[in-house]
């Protein structure tokens, strides 16, 4: 005899496969290409009194993203993924530093959230591929740390501007806060 509680049990979520995870990882690589191009573009596009400082900031950020792209490529090739992406998503362009930084914070927080999902998916992958899953867990923890800290650094750069933006806002303030 079944009880009413039996009718409400959730079906088990099937564990993710390694090929499916590598597809998601390739999508993450595309996001990293987007960040690289965004920062490199804005190193030259920003105008204003502090242009030299922002050029240096965005150039350094682009170098960091280039490292991320290389790390994702190395992992994908190391796991025999046949054709890692060479493309990025399109991105918004800005001439004002505060607009570019605001958007960059959003970009970094989106990937940070994706990396949290990947870490959860790697828990599912661990049963079938324990060593690979553990290695990729360390990899994604490092990526999460970098993206979160990049967003945090930009929030600090913009501390006063960000408060004003959020007050008058055309931006959703929750995009700037850690979840």
Which sequence ranges carry the predicted segments?
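Iron-associated oxidoreductase/ferritin-like identity signal
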Residues: 1-179
């Amino acid at each position: 005899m079944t009880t009413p509680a039996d009718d409400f049990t959730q079906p088990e979520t099937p564990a993710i496969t390694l090929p499916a995870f590598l597809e998601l990882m390739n999508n993450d690589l595309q996001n990293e290409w987007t960040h690289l191009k965004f920062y490199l573009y804005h190193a030259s596009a920003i105008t204003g009194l502090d242009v030299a400082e922002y050029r240096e900031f965005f150039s350094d950020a682009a170098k960091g993203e280039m490292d991320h792209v290389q790390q994702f490529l190395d992992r994908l090739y190391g796991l025999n993924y046949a054709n890692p992406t060479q493309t990025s998503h399109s991105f918004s362009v800005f001439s004002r530093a505060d607009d570019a930084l605001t958007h960059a914070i959003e970009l970094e927080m989106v990937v940070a959230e994706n990396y949290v999902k990947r870490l959860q998916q790697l828990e599912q992958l661990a049963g079938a591929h324990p060593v690979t899953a553990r290695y990729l867990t360390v990899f994604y923890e490092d990526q999460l740390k970098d993206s979160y800290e990049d967003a945090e650094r930009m929030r600090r750069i913009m501390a006063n501007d960000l408060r004003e933006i959020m007050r008058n806002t055309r931006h959703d303030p929750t995009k700037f806060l850690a979840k």
